Amino acid sequence: MKVLLIDDVLATGGTIGAAIELMHRLGAEVVHVLALLEIDGLQGRALLSAKYPDIPISSLVVS
């Protein structure tokens, strides 16, 4: 199963990272992450990109 993971806020990356791990344990493939708002100063995107380099991340608004 392929999954588009959508979250309201990308800050530190903790919630999205946990969701990706859960999807992997359930046998799903996360094909993209979409955040409605990204808080750039907290470096969540950098953390997620380093840990999951094959999963693209998009944000509608970056603050």
Please give the residue ranges for each predicted region.
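PRPP-dependent phosphoribosyltransferase catalytic core
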Residues: G17-S63
